[in-house]
UniProtKB/Swiss-Prot annotation:
Compartments, record wording: Cytoplasm
Subunit structure: Homodimer. Interacts with FtsZ.
Stored Pfam families: SepF (PF04472)
Record organism: Lactococcus lactis subsp. lactis (strain IL1403) (Streptococcus lactis)
Leader peptide range in chain numbering: none
Function of the molecule: Cell division protein that is part of the divisome complex and is recruited early to the Z-ring. Probably stimulates Z-ring formation, perhaps through the cross-linking of FtsZ protofilaments. Its function overlaps with FtsA.
Chain positions covered by the region annotation Disordered: 16-81
Protein name in the entry: Cell division protein SepF
UniProt biased composition (Polar residues): 56-69
Length: 196
């Protein structure tokens, strides 16, 4: 009886508090074929398996322990790959979310001041807009640039003169390398559309 009490105490030490353990341990120790027919004792023995392996050199191994240790090893290997599968699923979902966040640039050529509202809505939705004022008069273009500057300022974005009558409006999460832009624009006369 002392050995049985010692085994129960050892099992209780390794069984977590949230797991319920049924007490059909007496039939399990009396006849091994009943253990094979009932699935719950197998699950409990798998969880208790590491203590048998760690204590085995100190104890004398019996035939019953060696027979039950082999199925436990097979059961314990099935639980180890599961976290790896979860990690793989997370990386797939992360790559899918990265592919879903591809930025687009809308190109607009407004003909009147009222057409600028569509460009402002696009920037508000987090996309870039390239606006070409070639079909708009000088006074309306200046007024539109003032409006777009206010919209981009409110959204904490940026507006840049890309060339001639073309302006790029970007939301807050997108930056443009201004050094390359300034080297392209160097020496060209864009004073009539300068927003700075």
């Amino acid at each position: 009886m002392a050995f049985k009490d010692w085994m129960n105490n050892l099992r209780d030490y390794f069984v977590e508090d949230d797991e319920e353990f049924n007490e059909p341990a007496r039939p399990v120790q009396e006849s091994r074929p009943t253990v094979a027919s009932t699935p719950k004792p197998k699950v409990e023995e798998r969880k208790a398996q590491p203590e048998y392996q760690t204590r085995r050199p100190a104890q004398s191994t019996s035939k019953a322990q060696t027979q039950t240790a082999a199925p436990k090893r097979a059961g314990s290997t099935f639980t180890k790959p599961m976290p790896e599968k979860i990690v793989q699923q997370q990386t797939v979902s992360q790559s899918q979310s990265v592919a879903a966040t591809v930025s687009t640039i809308a190109i607009k050529e407004p003909r009147a001041y009222a057409d600028i509202m569509e460009s402002a809505r696009i920037v508000k939705n987090g996309e870039c807009v390239l606006v070409n004022f070639k079909f708009m008069g000088d006074a309306q273009a200046r007024r539109s640039i003032d409006f777009m500057t206010g919209v981009v300022f409110t959204l904490d974005g940026d507006i840049q003169n890309v060339g001639g009558q073309i302006f790029l409006m970007t939301p807050a999460n997108i930056t443009v390398d201004a050094a390359k832009e300034m080297s392209i624009l160097a020496g060209q006369n864009f004073e009539s559309y300068d927003i700075y």
